Amino acid sequence: MIQRVVRRATARRYGRIERYGANARAVQNEQLEYLLAAGRLTAFGRERSFGGIRSYDEFRRRVDVADYAGFAEYVERARRGERGVLWPGRVRWFAKSSGTTGRRSKYIPVTAEGVALNHMRGMRDVVTMATRIFPKADLFAGRMLTLGGSHSIEREGDAAEVGDLSAILIEHTPRMARLFRRPSRKVALTADFNRKVEALCRECATQNITALAGVPSWNLVMLTRLLEYTGRDNISQVWPNLQLFVHGGTDFRPYREVFRRMIPSQGMNYMETYNASEGFFAMADREGADDMLLMLDYGTFYEFLPTNCLADYEKAIPLAEVECGVEYAMIISNCNGLWRYMIGDTVEFTSVAPYRIRITGRTQSYINVFGEELVVDNAERAVEAACRATGAGVVEYTVAPVYMGGYHTQGAHQWLVEFRTMPDSVERWCEVLDEELRRCNSDYDAKRQGSATLLAPVVTILPRGTFMRQMATEGRLGGQNKVPRLRCDRELADALLNLK
């Protein structure tokens, strides 16, 4: 009943999304015009003469591509309460993010327009899309459980409020939506992640949960604890009406088999989204697809820089010029006051009519110490293949170089892996991992020829809970915190081995 009402109420919006393919250029031009009009009222815009910008070419000439370091000074001014720095008016909210590859915390501005036009529109569109992709799923017969971050809102004097993005969005969730959401606000905003999970189990174990949302790794922790708490064999016995997991934040491929075993219901569905502290960008629009539709009218103007020329920002191109099969670093300008901001994610287009993407990794997450140029997408594919071939299930993993021989001329990749389900054969798991890496990465394959430079992967199995213990020591439990998959150094690997 409610599902049918929602479908009718969102029909017009769904029609607009369907027309993305035909109207992409016009929609993106509208976003840029809107952003520039707002930017003219800011200190950032006045310094770059936004008032004189009449075209995209002029915009790119006057605004340099930058990462967080290039915006940090402006963000600090806004956090101190200065108005109109990056976006008109005062910015009250800041999403605290430690990122994936950096250790220093970032404070991403979250404006009122960013909440309304970006994050909340994205959440509504997930519902719009889910009711079309999974028409048989009765999602509104129960509650959606959202597992957010571990940072509650902290007030910084009278100027700013800082917290995990999920905590900020809870503060802005419409009253009607709260009726369908679990856990309670008190539990959701619990700062300690382990206490949050315990409270969530007590509160939600007997409720009618029909959908989950959040990061796969942290939901896996929660679901594992829920099984211990209830004494059940699988989640379908706890929540028999569970039909959808809306996931994002990390690649789902390494977790797919674990979730299928944990939730054996034939009616279970999975939907990927791409949202971060910086904004909401994409979501799946087809059942079973491994790509996502890029959302074009979220107050975001997109640009893309081929990853083979990351140091040459002049090679950045608008959406209209992208090609399928090329890996790009994504650059955004949006209504949170970010201007030509390189968010650190890399994507590949699978379609340009409409524009669909796959997340392939991070601009700073790779291993290239022997010329192998291993990227996250290669690693995720290989782990998925190895798990599928051996019946294994992975909780977390990370990869670091290990050197052998004199002068560091020969070495290997050390894979530190925490399994939920051990493979039938660890030796076979390693073989398939190596075979898949060689199949999908010609540079890796060349370095593996005859093991002259790169030896076979060295797999180190870590005890259950090792990654969580390490994340806890860093104060990074829950939310959008992620384990770096690939590192060119051994800092994380050695820290994990010391815990072991």
Mark where each language-model region is.
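Active-site glycine/GP-rich loop and adjacent strand/helix microenvironment
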Residues: 1-51, 59-63, 74, 81, ...
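ATP phosphate-binding P-loop of adenylate-forming
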Residues: 91-102, 459
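Active-site diphosphate/adenylate-binding microenvironment
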Residues: 26, 30-94, 105-110, 117, ...
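Long, hydrophobic, well-ordered secondary-structure blocks that form the structural core
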Residues: 109, 113-119, 245-246, 269
